[in-house]
């Protein structure tokens, strides 16, 4: 039998010990519609030891108040997973009896990160950062990663230059871009763009076109989307 739920009183606040079911840890994932979905897919989607009760969304406007759809969330989440505004974090931890919060986005200062950690722990939950060994995907083909510490640092022109150099060596090259998931997440699970008409078919935003069109103009192909593993497996068949 499961042990009884323990009820504590901390000052004027009652805290429920939600570990009565040790086989199912309640998780909330903090994100910005990118790494958060990937962390869910590789760490939690098919793991019955955890119950992801929601995502929070930051940085990008109008990406909250919707669902991570059932088709992407997997068999354990037939109703999908709600995406909330990050400003509701404290309330969600308390009302959803969250035991573990996984911080899953970048482009924040150390000070901002630790502020979030303090808020989470004050609400009673653990604060997690998922490391590379548990979340990186093994690739069968060589990968060149173009990274930067901040948005707008110039990754895109560097990526296009690298693609140009590799294509000049006679290699088949595909650019894989972090998604800009403003639309239908299910339709954006795996996206492949090889011509301007593909952008029209996908109803790409101006921001997406600004990113993808220069690759297409130099004869390249671009992959994007929410399910990174499915994207990787398709790219491995298309590129050297």
Model-predicted regions and their roles:
Residues 69-133:
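Phosphate-bearing ligand-interacting subdomains
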Residues 1-14:
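N-terminal amphipathic/basic-hydrophobic helices that include classical n-h-c signal peptides
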Residues 135-183:
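Walker A (P-loop) phosphate-binding motif
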Residues 165-240:
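ATP-dependent carboxylate-amine ligase catalytic core
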Residues 50-62, 175-177:
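Short internal beta-strands
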Residues 23-46:
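Glycine-rich adenosine-cofactor-binding loop
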Residues 59-80, 184-189:
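N-terminal beta-loop-helix "entrance" segment that forms/cooperates
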